[in-house]
């Protein structure tokens, strides 16, 4: 695990979130990884990407067969292009024009990694000491071309058993580049980036904790055009609000993670509107699965000066029980986890216990 300067809690939390999201960061590649020279979120991403790229290159960059067309060679290889050989008058030089397939690491997926590293090298928000590691990583990509990060076709990337080790690294690169572009355009702040990262961690935690033989945990995508009062950066950085649904044979819990921003704190009616909106989605979910449905809004506080110690609160909205709780992005994960567990305990666990009691009474009769 990384060595850390105690005073930089933001970087510690961000690193721990990334470790939770990407198992590779907890592996041997990062055994000697240190955070003591990292002071910004951009530097953290740069340090992780460069270490990851270096480790990948040491194992051997992924190669594919690349078509080399109309190459002038001294000995025949692949398909000989007779017409082109005559046109170029290669006979006098003792050569032939050939087209052939060659196994090469100079391919698009490696171009993306090199392009990302080059971008980080010239990023003014990355610490100079971190750039030393970026330069070392770039040296591992000699002989590989690069692509302009503004022209990357992410959907063109195809994964198979041989290049699956790239998947999470490419995903991290895309997230980092998209967020930094949004920051430059004034759409996103570092605190909001932490919120986005935290939201991903919360979703993964619910899936890993409660997806078992008793419960099914799934992600429910709700397009933002169907949501009200969403922060502007949410609308511009993603297409949908990804709710978590925990469901068993008796009931279901629909969890919506939202940002606790200044607008929410100033407008006393906004929290109620969020709850009523969640009721609408609970009703749709009930119509689909025919089970009793509860809802819970998990607000994420990004204000370092405030700490939320209040327990979960629950209110009835149109015959639906809707909970509300607040977690702090800069708090220790242990305390965050306890609050998330309360969401499950109050709704799913309590409903299960109630059903068991009813069944026991019936069996005694």
Label each residue range with its predicted role.
Residues 1-187, 341-365:
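Terminal, charged accessory segments of proteins
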């Amino acid at each position: 695990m990384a060595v850390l300067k105690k005073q930089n809690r933001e970087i510690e939390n961000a690193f721990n979130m990334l470790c939770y999201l990407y198992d590779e960061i907890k592996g041997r590649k990062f055994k000697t990884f240190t955070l003591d020279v990292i002071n910004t979120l951009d530097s953290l991403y740069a340090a992780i990407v460069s270490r990851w790229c270096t480790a990948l290159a040491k194992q051997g960059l992924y190669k594919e067969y690349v078509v080399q067309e109309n190459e002038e060679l001294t000995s025949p290889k692949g398909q000989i292009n007779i017409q082109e050989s005559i046109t170029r008058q290669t006979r006098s030089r003792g050569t032939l024009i050939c087209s052939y397939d060659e196994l090469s690491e100079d391919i698009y997926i490696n171009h993306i990694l090199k392009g990302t590293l080059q971008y980080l090298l010239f990023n003014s928000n990355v610490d100079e000491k971190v750039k030393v590691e970026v330069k070392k990583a770039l040296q591992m990509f000699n002989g590989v071309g690069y692509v302009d990060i503004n022209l990357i076709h992410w959907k063109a990337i195809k994964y198979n058993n041989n290049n699956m080790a790239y998947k999470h690294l490419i995903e991290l690169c895309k997230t980092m580049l998209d967020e930094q572009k949004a920051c430059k355009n004034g759409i996103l702040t570092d605190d909001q980036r932490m919120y986005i990262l935290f939201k991903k961690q919360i979703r993964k935690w619910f899936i890993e904790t409660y997806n078992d033989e008793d419960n099914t945990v799934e992600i429910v995508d709700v397009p933002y055009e169907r949501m009200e009062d969403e922060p502007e950066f949410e609308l511009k950085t993603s297409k949908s609000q990804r709710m978590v649904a925990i469901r068993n044979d008796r009931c279901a819990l629909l969890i919506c993670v939202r940002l606790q921003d200044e607008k929410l704190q100033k407008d006393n009616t906004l929290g109620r509107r969020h709850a009523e909106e969640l009721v609408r989605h609970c009703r749709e979910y009930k119509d689909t699965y025919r089970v009793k449905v509860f809802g819970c809004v998990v607000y994420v506080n990004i204000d370092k000066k405030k700490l939320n110690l209040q327990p979960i609160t629950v209110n009835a909205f149109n015959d639906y029980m809707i909970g509300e709780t607040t977690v702090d992005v800069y708090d220790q994960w242990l305390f965050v986890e306890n609050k998330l567990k309360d969401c499950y305990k109050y709704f799913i666990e309590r409903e299960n216990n109630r059903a068991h009691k009813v069944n026991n009474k019936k069996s005694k009769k």
